[in-house]
């Protein structure tokens, strides 16, 4: 029988004689290559160790003198776990709520087959913040997106009257809805799809920000289309902001052709774009919305689908479920994530600090018009795009920012996404801009 000996905490956490505090960045990389799947390409020569404050991580880098296993430096978190930590790293209000419920309230772990009192708190808070009739809790963001697809199909059969097994879903090209089989079936990204087929049928693709193409598809196949699933702003594609009239027209077309308008707010929600949810930027209200990431404030994985009662009510006992979806600790975490979003005015701060950051991007673009094509975004979901030249490499920029104490990450070759905590200060924004200017000047 294989034995595993585990002891200690933090740096003293020891697995079969290997103590974390003794490992260099190269040691961590070697362990990951030997023992883990290679489905990520982490930034080289850096290992995050702990949190200093809401926007700052403590990381370990190789000792330039080669004496110690590592040196420690501060790192401003400009990625926020892909917008999962909008409330800031280890937000004290949420952490204390979790600790109190674990240690004083003796919060249980039970499934949905028996009611627990914290579900009521979650449902009341989630419907209030989203403005939706009903909510179904899940765990991962991709589960929320997938539930949008399942709900659309079921509504299509049971309410719209689409013949059995003929329902179609529509998605936008260059989308990102996660990594499940549904999500990659809906994806147009070659790397996400390669050698994972055969894919799920019944999915149609139209260009993003092209309502005319959507209308043509609705005219041709609208009687069998159950739902259109779309990101308000495409995040993983490079922070692609649609025209102001796109979502209003999409909502109108969906209503005209009796198609569910479903928005994936997993990355754009919870204040990230300067409003509570990005669809609000365009004055529309979806039939369904999927939320995740910051719904758990980076402390617990929490997601959910919210929507009109007519749609959610198509679910019946046994038709949908999740062991940890809405379990008590997740419910409490989500409630306090919402509390912080509202009481700390995170959307407003994102709006103000995002405008400041975009002003910096424009100033840098003007100083380097041969290198920076544009800066774009809404709130603190931002990106800057360089021209398509070999020396203007996004990964090189990410590594340069790392040397300047900023953690940001390229998305596609020439675009770098910057999405810090919504609690960031003006000084933090200026620090990002100063570092970026220095790195761009060095290219």
Which stretches of residues belong to each language-model region?
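Conserved N-terminal phosphate-binding loop of PLP-dependent enzymes in the Aspartate aminotransferase
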Residues: 2-443
